[in-house]
Amino acid sequence: PYYSLMAYKNLIAPLFSPRARKMIGGGLGDRSALAVDILEEVGFERDARVPYKPAGNLPLGYLKRLELARCIALKSDVMICDEVFSGLGAAEISSLFPLLARLNREGVTLIMIEHRLKELFRIANRVIVLHYGEKLFDGSPEEALKNEAVKEAYFGKGKEARL
């Protein structure tokens, strides 16, 4: 994000992208209101004036939501989420699930790079496991948890293995 800009202003540029412009039309004022609406949709509290705070003053959970909001503003068909759960507490992670699930239901393909497997497996319908740059597994989360090569690569072998 642009840390010196207010959170909602981080969405103005994506809302002027050719793709978004074709879909929504309107002028700058319309886009400002739409930016605040999108931020509210991803969990920014309008009443607490969070959309009007500089992005650099926001906690990590809000910064991650801001990045998701920027993708929503672009009307992306595919979103690559790199460690979206990293650094977040259980409550923050839980609050992201409905948003990610809704985006997926609406046709957005989510490609997630994530080491927090427990959380990832709650939302994923397909998992590709890489180990040292090589594809180790491709299948459902349930199958991944049963796969011996995946368990050994990510959880260790024998006594040190933990899920």
Task: State each model region's role.
Residues 12, 26-49, 53, 98-101:
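Conserved ABC ATPase "signature" region
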